[in-house]
C-alpha cells in the first residue's frame, strides 16, 4: 500500500487522513427534491395587526396570553350525527365542513417538481432509492373521487364493502376479497 496523497476533511482541521493511490474521492450525493402540489395555493390578505393571530389560527398554536394564563383554547370540532351503515352498502352523504379534498372548489392540480443540487453520477447501491416509494398512480387516479364546489354542504362518503356484491356473496362464500363502492350520487 503506497500512500501518495493526504486529504483533509475540514479546512481548519490539523488531522489528515492518508489515501491510497487507487482510491477516489467520493462526494455525498444530494437527494432529489420532489414536491407534489395537490391543492392550489390560496392567497390570504391581512394587515400587520392581524398577521400574528392569522398565523396562530392556521397553525393551531395558542396566543401568548392564553399560554401564560393556563386557559385552554377551545378546539373547533365539526360534529355530525352518526348515520347507521346500510346493509346494501350504498354511499352515505354526510354534512360537513370537510375541506381536505374539496378545497378551492374542486379546482385541483397535481404538479410534480424535480430538482437536485448536483447532477453528478450516483452510487445507487449505497443510498436508499426513493423512486419506488411514491408510485406513479396515473392521471385517472384523482378523477375517481367526487369533486364538488366548496359552496356545497354535502360530502360523498364511501362504505367499505367486504363482500364484493350481494349477488356474488351467495356464490363465493369462501372468497374474502375487498373493494370500495365508489358510485357517484348527486345529492345537490
Swiss-Prot record:
InterPro entries: VQ, VQ_8/17/18/20/21/25. It holds the Pfam family VQ. The keyword Disulfide bond does not apply. Keywords: Nucleus. It is found in: Nucleus. Residues 161-179 have a biased composition (Low complexity). One of its GO terms (cellular component) is nucleus. May function as positive regulator of plant growth. This is VQ motif-containing protein 18. The gene is VQ18.
Amino acid at each position: 500500500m503506497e500512500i501518495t496523497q493526504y486529504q483533509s476533511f475540514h479546512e481548519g482541521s490539523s488531522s489528515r487522513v492518508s489515501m491510497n493511490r487507487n482510491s477516489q474521492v467520493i462526494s455525498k450525493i444530494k437527494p432529489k427534491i420532489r414536491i407534489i402540489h395537490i391543492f392550489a395555493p390560496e392567497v390570504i390578505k391581512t394587515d400587520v395587526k392581524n398577521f400574528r393571530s392569522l398565523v396562530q389560527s392556521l397553525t393551531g398554536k395558542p396566543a401568548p396570553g392564553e399560554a401564560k394564563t393556563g386557559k385552554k383554547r377551545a378546539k373547533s370540532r365539526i360534529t355530525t350525527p352518526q348515520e347507521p351503515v346500510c346493509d346494501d352498502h350504498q354511499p352515505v352523504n354526510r354534512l360537513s365542513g370537510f375541506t381536505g379534498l374539496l378545497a378551492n372548489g374542486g379546482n385541483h392540480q397535481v404538479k410534480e417538481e424535480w430538482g437536485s443540487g448536483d447532477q453528478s453520477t450516483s452510487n445507487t447501491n449505497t443510498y436508499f432509492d426513493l423512486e419506488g416509494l411514491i408510485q406513479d398512480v396515473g392521471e385517472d387516479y384523482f378523477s375517481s373521487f367526487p369533486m364538488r364546489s366548496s359552496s356545497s354542504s354535502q360530502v360523498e362518503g364511501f362504505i367499505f364493502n367486504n363482500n364484493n356484491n350481494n349477488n356474488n356473496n351467495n356464490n363465493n362464500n369462501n372468497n374474502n376479497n375487498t373493494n370500495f363502492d365508489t358510485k357517484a350520487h348527486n345529492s345537490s
